[in-house]
Amino acid sequence: MLWIGANTDYNTNFPLPEVLRMDKAPLEYQYFKGKVPKDSDVHGFYNLKDKTIYIRGEYPIEHPWSQGLILHELLHYVQDMNNVKFKCVAEMEKDVWPLQKKYLKEVHNFDWNYDQLWYMTISSCGEY
């Protein structure tokens, strides 16, 4: 939360949410409420209803990728707690991906070079 507070304008004065680690199959079952698409590859999500962060557990918790996933979902928690409004769900990702990339580099010296076209696609509202 300290890193988020220092690198964003969000209020971070909230209790930390619960973080649950799960294997891929149960995590995706939870995320999709039982109707998991064949090509799914969910790494984590923040549940608005129970204020819980769910992440895949294949990496040790101290691994940079696990830390990056937690930060990513923690940013969604902070967006929620700050009552940030979005035009669509995808728009929630617009600030989060670059912040996750920055965090991974600054804190863990981990380079995450995601595809910019993919980022634009998953972080923009559009007519689908």
Named regions from a protein language model:
Residues 68-81:
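Active-site recognition of the HExxH zinc-binding catalytic motif
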Residues 50-55, 78-80:
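Acidic/histidine-rich, surface-exposed loop or edge segments in extracytoplasmic proteins
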Residues 89-124:
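Post-HExxH zinc-binding segment in Zn-dependent metallohydrolases
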